[in-house]
Amino acid sequence: MDDFFMIWLLPLLIIVGKTLLLLVVLLVLVAYLLYADRKIWAAVQLRRGPNVVGPWGLLQSFADLIKFVVKEPIIPAGANKGVFLLAPFVSATLALSTWAVIPVNEGWEVAKINVGLLYILAISSLEVYGVIMGGWASNSKYPFLGALRSAAQMVSYEVSIGFVLVTVILVSGSLDLTTIVHKQSYGIGTTLGFPFNSFLDWNWLVLFPMFIIFFISALAETNRPPFDLVEAESELVAGHMVEYSSTPYMLFFLGEYVAIVLMCALTTILFLGGWLPPLDVWWLNWVPGIIWFVLKVCFVFFWFAMVKAFVPRYRYDQLMRLGWKVFLPFSLAMVVITATFLKYTGFA
């Protein structure tokens, strides 16, 4: 009995505990990042934003949660009921499951696997199924058109993201996210004679063009402005979510924002040194790594929100041209250049 507990039950309980803790922290983080998104957008437009529920409106996201949960879900008469209700669960579950391999600090991940980057890419490519299911099951042309747009957009920019990840893998020599962070503890800043490890060693500097491509592709992959053609209010209203209400709509919304925070976390890990402090000095090393990680995620999300506030929406043909005719050839060329440089210089 003791062997069964130590070998099987205890590891299972630890994994379940880690998962529940991550889920609670992630949902709270998403709630306040959504609040920050609305506040930033309001500030740019000289409005006050959410300011009624709780002090300074800090409880607005939780009030919205209660509102969605207590509402009655309405299913269109001609909809495929099973697929219609399954689609938002698929979207939210896939978005949440990618966080299993995200290390928020040294050794702080639910599942430690040495191909974490490949796992994230694989799960992210499946998220399009939830969108397609929701658009098709609604039995309406507008959700279906929005779903087709979303599928084409996500597939188009996943290619560029894939090539960006290849360059990071070439520089780091690993698919393990923890190893990728460790590799950024020394780099071009140290090579150029900077007295101690710093933010100049992170991948954002040595791979700056790929950093920009990844950031813009992340906006397109998550259907954020200026690439929110899926939810173009003047054309398709809310895209594939037009016929959804109540809890199913909330699950789609949750999946969308969890995916956005995931892209912010990936940007932090791949290019901004993960949980590493900006300067390797004792008074910054004293700050826990998870604090640096969360601050960097919030910094990236701030720019996600600012782009939404001041960049106008692209036309659909411009969106596709940017992905296939600009980002794809440029990222492919960068892969070749990076691989050639590493082979003939010996840097790694």
Swiss-Prot record:
Cellular localization per UniProt: Cell inner membrane
Residues that span the membrane, as ranges: 7-27, 82-102, 115-135, 161-181, 199-219, 251-271, 287-307, 322-342
GO CC terms, sorted: plasma membrane
Catalytic reaction list: a quinone + NADH + 5 H(+)(in) = a quinol + NAD(+) + 4 H(+)(out)
EC nos: 7.1.1.-
Recorded topology in the membrane: Multi-pass membrane protein
Record function comment: NDH-1 shuttles electrons from NADH, via FMN and iron-sulfur (Fe-S) centers, to quinones in the respiratory chain. The immediate electron acceptor for the enzyme in this species is believed to be ubiquinone. Couples the redox reaction to proton translocation (for every two electrons transferred, four hydrogen ions are translocated across the cytoplasmic membrane), and thus conserves the redox energy in a proton gradient. This subunit may bind ubiquinone.
Protein name: NADH-quinone oxidoreductase subunit H
Organism: Bartonella quintana (strain Toulouse) (Rochalimaea quintana)
Upper classification of the organism: Bacteria, Pseudomonadati, Pseudomonadota, Alphaproteobacteria, Hyphomicrobiales
Protein encoded by which gene: nuoH
